[in-house]
From Swiss-Prot:
Entry annotated with the keyword RNA-binding: no
Entry keywords, A to Z: Disulfide bond, Fibrinogenolytic toxin, Fibrinolytic toxin, Hemostasis impairing toxin, Hydrolase, Metal-binding, Metalloprotease, Protease, Secreted, Toxin, Zinc
Lineage of source species: Eukaryota, Metazoa, Chordata, Craniata, Vertebrata
Disulphide-bridged cysteine pairs: none
Family: Belongs to the venom metalloproteinase (M12B) family. P-I subfamily.
Organism: Bothrops leucurus (Whitetail lancehead)
Activity regulation (record text): Inhibited by EDTA and 1,10-phenanthroline. Not inhibited by beta-mercaptoethanol, benzamidine and aprotinin.
GO cellular component term of the entry, any: extracellular region
Subcellular localization, as worded in the UniProt entry: Secreted
Range of residues in the leader sequence: none
Protein name in UniProt: Snake venom metalloproteinase BleucMP
Coiled-coil residue spans: none
Length: 9
């Protein structure tokens, strides 16, 4: 998942 701040989770 790509978060709203641009980090992969």
């Amino acid at each position: 998942t790509l978060t709203s701040f641009g980090e992969w989770r």
